[in-house]
């Protein structure tokens, strides 16, 4: 039977389906019990037990718990464990991520555990390593585990969090009401919950953070897409003034050092808003538990140490569970366990593309084909193109700015013609943009895709001998890729030019008709994903 987990990467929490995570948690429950009871027979069911099986820790950012948790998990498996010394590695000589990891994969290393400030790096390495594996006929396809990438995600922390929540919920997946408290902007552990909490049938999330530390919009949108009920509060004090208080509280450390001087001036006020105080205890419902990915700040802990010996303490067992979860994850990816998984096939991470986002409009030769004036001041042309209805409904300044972007992206800088901002013939108060170019123009399917990506909801008219030869209406494509001038606006993203990795930007459409970067998840409008066209 084919093992569905062997060689799989975990770059974001959604790389494992809900059924696959339930399988992992069931196995973790079994292994944890075996270790506590020193049941060697059950432990051996999980052990990789192969001295030639290479697991490599590559931590390019400081870590204690995650690194040591993985190290101890790997030692349990009795494998070849290596650790890249980042300070003396070829990264400091300007070597790319792809070259470094391909080299290490060539030395018969099978699983890479990676922590980096660069967001989306594991997703890129997964794609790159697949090609390297095939070119060089390696014994195993390298797998990558994201141990935290910038402020993006921390999927193994999400796994151990979920396991602990479920363990404390009598192994029920029915519902969860959770309060996320602290630095929700930088805290990648809370970002993973936007998809991770889908494992519960009913999810209610209370976001508790001042505006400066609030959850990024992308993750709030993801929660809403996933059917979560989401509420927002600016402080613990405000949250406890209302009656519907969660039993599960998840705190994160404020990372104020990553923010500017204006925020640092308010640090005492910001910390106070997300730090639990003694007077709050009497306002908590019975059976409330607190969790924290750790570490706690020794001077300014959001969960003060006076709570350590109280029933609120769920964070210590949560930390211990991390090693058990990671033991099982390594066992699954190595193919030691997983043959007995009977869940459905995982859905492809590729987005659906077989939809009509370029629609050819039928031309009525007796009437519609005659070129009429598109707008006041724009005379009909005999041959050429007219792109109409650009940014309909926007302000004239916005329309003009985006028309210049369309001209650059579509390569329409040369030749005669012009641009015009006008009002709609049907709605005089609604502005739209028009680009017209007389001359001989041909539009390939690739050109139409490009136009759809940069000028959604416009109309393209191809004109010959004074008649409309063909007409197309554009809509937002489900994915945008294979264009050199695409750019993710997040400088920490592996695909951003600032990283000098040569990774092509790829975007997929969200449910609210915007675009998310495939690597880091940053949300863009279709107007924001284009850089300057490369010559």
UniProtKB/Swiss-Prot annotation:
Region entry Aspartate carbamoyltransferase regulatory region, spans: 371-535
Pathway in which the depicted protein is active: Pyrimidine metabolism; UMP biosynthesis via de novo pathway; (S)-dihydroorotate from bicarbonate: step 2/3
InterPro entries for the chain: Asp/Orn_carbamoyltranf_P-bd (IPR006132), Asp/Orn_carbamoylTrfase (IPR006130), Asp/Orn_carbamoylTrfase_sf (IPR036901), Asp_carbamoyltransf (IPR002082), Asp_carbamoyltransf_Asp/Orn-bd (IPR006131), Asp_carbamoyltransf_reg_N (IPR020545), Asp_carbamoylTrfase_reg (IPR002801), Asp_carbamoyltrfase_reg_C (IPR020542)
Molecular function GO labels: amino acid binding; aspartate carbamoyltransferase activity; metal ion binding
UniProtKB keywords: Metal-binding, Multifunctional enzyme, Pyrimidine biosynthesis, Transferase, Zinc
Gene3D superfamilies in the cross-refs: Aspartate carbamoyltransferase regulatory subunit, N-terminal domain, Aspartate/ornithine carbamoyltransferase
GO terms, biological process: 'de novo' pyrimidine nucleobase biosynthetic process; 'de novo' UMP biosynthetic process; amino acid metabolic process
PROSITE patterns: CARBAMOYLTRANSFERASE (PS00097)
Keyword Metal-binding applies: yes
Binding site for Zn(2+): 488, 493, 517, 520
Linker as annotated region, ranges: 342-370
GO cellular component, one term: aspartate carbamoyltransferase complex
EC number(s) stated in the UniProt entry for this protein: 2.1.3.2
Chemical reaction(s) catalysed: carbamoyl phosphate + L-aspartate = N-carbamoyl-L-aspartate + phosphate + H(+)
Enzyme class: transferase
SUPFAM superfamilies linked: Aspartate carbamoyltransferase, Regulatory-chain, C-terminal domain (SSF57825), Aspartate carbamoyltransferase, Regulatory-chain, N-terminal domain (SSF54893), Aspartate/ornithine carbamoyltransferase (SSF53671)
Start and end residues of each stretch annotated as Aspartate carbamoyltransferase: 1-341
Listed PANTHER family: ASPARTATE CARBAMOYLTRANSFERASE REGULATORY CHAIN
Record-stated family: In the N-terminal section; belongs to the aspartate/ornithine carbamoyltransferase superfamily. ATCase family.
Protein name: Protein PyrBI
């Amino acid at each position: 039977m084919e093992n569905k987990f062997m060689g799989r990467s975990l770059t974001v929490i959604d790389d494992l389906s809900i059924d696959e995570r339930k399988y992992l948690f069931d196995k973790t429950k079994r292994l944890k019990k075996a270790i506590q009871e020193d049941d060697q027979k059950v432990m051996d069911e999980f052990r990789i037990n192969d001295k030639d099986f290479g697991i490599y820790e590559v931590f390019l950012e400081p870590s204690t718990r995650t690194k040591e948790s993985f190290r101890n998990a790997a030692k349990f498996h009795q494998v070849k464990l290596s650790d890249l010394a980042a300070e003396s590695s070829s990264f400091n000589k300007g070597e790319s991520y792809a070259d470094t990891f391909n080299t290490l994969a060539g030395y018969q290393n099978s699983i890479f555990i990676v922590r980096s400030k660069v967001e989306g790096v594991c997703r890129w390495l997964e794609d790159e390593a697949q090609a390297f594996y095939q070119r060089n006929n390696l014994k195993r396809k390298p797998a990558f585990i994201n141990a935290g990438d910038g402020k993006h995600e921390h999927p193994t922390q999400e796994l151990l969090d979920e396991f602990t929540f479920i363990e404390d919920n009598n192994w029920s997946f029915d519902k969860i009401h959770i309060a996320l408290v602290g630095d929700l902007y930088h805290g990648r552990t809370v970002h993973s919950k936007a998809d991770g909490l889908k494992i519960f049938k009913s999810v209610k999330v209370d976001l508790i953070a001042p505006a400066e530390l609030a959850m990024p919009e992308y993750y709030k949108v993801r929660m809403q897409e996933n059917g979560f009920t989401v509420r927002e509060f600016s402080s613990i004090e405000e949250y406890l003034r209302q009656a519907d208080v969660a039993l599960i509280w998840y705190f994160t450390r404020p990372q104020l050092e990553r923010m500017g001087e204006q925020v640092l001036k308010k640090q005492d006020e910001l910390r106070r808003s997300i730090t639990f105080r003694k007077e709050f205890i009497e306002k908590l419902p019975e059976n409330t538990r607190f969790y924290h990915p750790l570490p706690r700040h020794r001077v300014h802990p959001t969960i003060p140490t006076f709570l350590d010996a109280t029933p609120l303490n769920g964070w210590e067992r949560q930390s211990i569970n991390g090693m058990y979860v990671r033991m099982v994850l390594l066992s699954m990816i190595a193919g030691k366990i997983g043959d007995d998984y009977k869940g459905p096939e995982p859905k492809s991470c590729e987005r659906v593309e077989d939809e009509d986002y370029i629609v050819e409009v039928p031309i009525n030769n007796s009437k519609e084909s005659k070129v009429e004036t598109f707008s006041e001041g724009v005379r009909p042309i005999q041959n050429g193109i007219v792109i109409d209805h650009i940014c309909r409904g926007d302000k004239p300044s916005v329309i003009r700015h985006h028309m210049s972007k369309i001209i650059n992206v579509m390569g329409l800088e040369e030749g005669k013609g012009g641009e015009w901002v006008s009002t709609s013939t049907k709605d005089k108060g609604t502005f739209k943009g028009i680009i017209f170019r007389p001359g001989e123009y041909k539009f390939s399917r690739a050109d139409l895709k490009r136009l759809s990506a940069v000028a959604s909801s416009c109309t393209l008219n191809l004109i010959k001998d004074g008649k409309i030869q063909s007409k197309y209406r554009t809509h937002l494509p489900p994915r945008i890729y294979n264009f050199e001038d695409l750019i993710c606006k997040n400088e920490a993203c592996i695909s951003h030019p600032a990283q000098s990795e040569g990774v092509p930007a790829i975007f997929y459409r969200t449910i609210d008709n915007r675009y998310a970067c495939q690597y880091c998840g940053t949300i863009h409008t279709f107007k924001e994903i284009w850089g300057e066209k490369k010559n």
